[in-house]
């Protein structure tokens, strides 16, 4: 029935002279989201709108599912597009549309007509009234409700084309990917970091990711789990380059030479350093973590202060003020929760002290890090140079 979809967007519409940049980015992201959907589609800007036109048979549910993952979209409207062949033809097309779209006609409705072509022989109010009358004649069981109608029939007269629609599927909102710079996500196998990546991507940030692998203490299953999480996030963010860093030797050196109650803090500081160096080499302008205040010992305010100190670029923590259940709710919504709870440990969960320090002193931490002098430099260089890069689309 539907050969086209009208794409509605929110914040993009107030971007002024730069609006076309955001619209073009949204068009690119829509095309990317549809690349694996069966069928052929033409995505284009026209008359201040974005349209997805189906050029071949397609699966409606699959198209809707793909488009609801595209940041920047606030609404997806399946539309019937007709040529302007006069009001009688329009009325017949509207009646045909309602007959096919709604099996149950015992509904309330409202007609909302809009014209960009002001030389149309009827004004919007006249169109509303005339179409409403024709609908009541065709379907006596339908009733008019101008306040809370069950069917809001939209009729848009744009040039020589008229859009007819009454269904609007909510989109995720946000901004198109790539319109707000690039950031490096520290991605673990937990619940929080995939959600953090999703949330910062929603604001238009292109995502790259770094995962710290510690074989043989962490398994290949743990690594595959993180790859699977990156694939889930990429459904929303677009392609992700996943940097897999072998962290075993650095972790062992910290374990052997530093106080055990400070292991997590010092380890996190080196993770941040490595992620920042990898990010700088690929054009990132910030780091993204899934840290939430007070959730674990390494995420107290004092601990975050210590880990932040090693960074020269900003660190974004999108879930920092969320309760755990709020984070879980988002992870279930985006489809990452079931993967995150698979029981495969990552390097953050091994060599954890029974009583880790919760109020670390930065000066003491830095003093204890000098125990690594003469050892850590070569290990750090090797970790960077041997990083495995996996492109996930």
UniProtKB/Swiss-Prot annotation:
Primary location class: cytoplasm
Q: Which reaction does it catalyse?
A: [ThiI sulfur-carrier protein]-S-sulfanyl-L-cysteine + a uridine in tRNA + 2 reduced [2Fe-2S]-[ferredoxin] + ATP + H(+) = [ThiI sulfur-carrier protein]-L-cysteine + a 4-thiouridine in tRNA + 2 oxidized [2Fe-2S]-[ferredoxin] + AMP + diphosphate; [ThiS sulfur-carrier protein]-C-terminal Gly-Gly-AMP + S-sulfanyl-L-cysteinyl-[cysteine desulfurase] + AH2 = [ThiS sulfur-carrier protein]-C-terminal-Gly-aminoethanethioate + L-cysteinyl-[cysteine desulfurase] + A + AMP + 2 H(+)
Per UniProt, residues of the THUMP domain are 61-168
Q: Which GO terms describe its cellular component?
A: cytosol
> EC number(s) in its UniProt entry?
2.8.1.4
Q: Which GO terms describe its biological process?
A: thiamine biosynthetic process; thiamine diphosphate biosynthetic process; thiazole biosynthetic process; tRNA 4-thiouridine biosynthesis
Residues at which ATP binds: 186-187, 211-212, 268, 290, 299
State the UniProt keywords alphabetically: ATP-binding, Cytoplasm, Nucleotide-binding, RNA-binding, Thiamine biosynthesis, Transferase, tRNA-binding
Q: Does the keyword tRNA-binding apply?
A: yes
Q: What are this entry's molecular-function GO terms?
A: ATP binding; CCA tRNA nucleotidyltransferase activity; tRNA binding; tRNA-uracil-4 sulfurtransferase activity
Q: In which pathway does it act?
A: Cofactor biosynthesis; thiamine diphosphate biosynthesis
The identity of this protein, by name, is: Probable tRNA sulfurtransferase
Name the species this protein comes from: Lachnospira eligens (strain ATCC 27750 / DSM 3376 / VPI C15-48 / C15-B4)
